[in-house]
Design a protein with these regions (language model features):
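Polybasic, Ser/Thr-rich amphipathic helices
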Residues: 183-188
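TRAFAC-class small GTPase G-domain
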Residues: 1-182
């Protein structure tokens, strides 16, 4: 009797200030939809998506959309520890959301292992005329925080899939690395 090795369910957490477009980013990736007007997320929402990788493997991800308001941070912090990856989103048209990135990175580092794959995403690049944060500023912030940087538009869908493709590959490799270390510890 053969047993098929199943990939685990990878949990990816979306973090960032309120109104940066986390829910739109979430819906664009999960359902390929965009709503111009929507209510702010209260607490958390999650959905599971099966993703086919370039090499033909399929994996399941559970994407968690979190509330960005300060009053919900205690609730969302409980989910940090079980995350395999974190996408930290800011709005390129709102400088304050960019300036808060360091606070988010500090929270992430306090709550999760340094082994959790984290990426920084500048959203709303479709609104070029109102842009307040340059791509170079986003790249500099990511470099300072030691994480990768991407830009996207949840509205148009631009660059959403490449962000997830890169993140999922890094998460799988990271998961294998961490598990190999655990295996070595338990067997030494």
């Amino acid at each position: 009797m053969t047993t098929e090795k199943k990939e685990p369910l990878y949990k990816i957490l979306l973090l960032g200030d309120s109104s940066v477009g986390k829910t739109c980013f979430f819906m664009r990736y999960i359902e390929n939809t965009f709503q111009e007007i929507h209510m702010s997320t209260i607490g958390l929402e999650s959905k599971i998506k099966t993703v086919e990788l370039d090499d033909g493997r399929t994996v399941k991800i559970q994407l968690w959309d979190t509330a960005g308001q300060e009053r919900f941070h205690t609730i969302t912090k409980n989910y940090y520890k079980t995350a395999h990856a974190i996408i930290l989103i800011f709005d390129v048209t709102e400088k304050a959301t960019y300036q808060n990135v360091k606070n988010w990175v500090e929270q992430i580092r306090e709550e999760v292992s340094s082994k959790v794959v984290t990426v920084l995403v500048g959203n709303k690049i479709d609104d070029e005329e109102n842009r307040k944060v340059t791509k170079e500023e986003g790249e500099a912030m990511a470099k300072e925080c030691g994480i990768s940087y991407f830009e996207c538009s949840a509205k148009t869908g631009e660059n959403i899939d490449p962000i997830f493709n890169d993140l999922i590959k890094k998460t799988i490799e990271n998961y294998k690395f961490v598990n190999s270390k655990i295996y070595i510890i338990f067997n030494s």
